């Protein structure tokens, strides 16, 4: 969307945001954001300490776009997050990995690459993209037009795009590679066909990419988020 035809950017890695849950602590099917408002999981829910990620969860649960600029939709999402707050153990970012691995929480909102890492450490963990949809994101490389060493930058990107290097990078960072040739080199069939690393079109059907909404809307989101955190 930001670069039609990939004329100016090269995709580096991609992924989704979803729910990581401990199968020994959650005894029901997990397919909806709704479970993050279940009172029986009080003090065992981890939310992202991020305004767009947390509002994205609430907005999608309510059936809205995670890029909504509608003030009523945003205030409804804010109220939903305020209602949820007594159930939340903590608002975290990277800490969600360690807390879920050690069994300190039953449910956590997490990035898919982090989910793959946590599963390696704790096989009782499972990841799902809720049916209402979520955020699908992509990190890309670009070279500024005034780059003083353009040829070096191009060489670096070309190196990272080599299938063998892209494979090594994927195995290290555990975030999905968009390099199809690198994916074919993955020897572990479970990883190569993983719905976490490589979800199919049906799983992504209701997902969206965050877009920049402008400074004024960003300020509105931030004000609403501050009230959630201080409630």
Residue ranges of model-derived segments:
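Mature extracytoplasmic/periplasmic domains
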Residues: 144-205
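Ligand-binding "clamshell"
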Residues: 1-6, 117-129, 190-195
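Conserved C-terminal helix/tail region of periplasmic/extracytoplasmic solute-binding proteins
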Residues: 201-231
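A bilobed periplasmic-binding-protein/Venus flytrap-type ligand-binding module shared by bacterial periplasmic
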Residues: 18-25, 60-63, 137-149, 168
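Extracytoplasmic ligand-binding site segments that recognize negatively charged/polar headgroups
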Residues: 1-104
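Short, hydrophobic alpha-helical packing/hinge segments within bilobed ligand-binding/sensory domains
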Residues: 33, 96-97, 115, 153, ...
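A ligand-binding cleft/hinge motif common to bilobed small-molecule-binding domains
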Residues: 101-102, 107-124
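Periplasmic-binding protein-like
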Residues: 74-83, 89, 121-147, 191
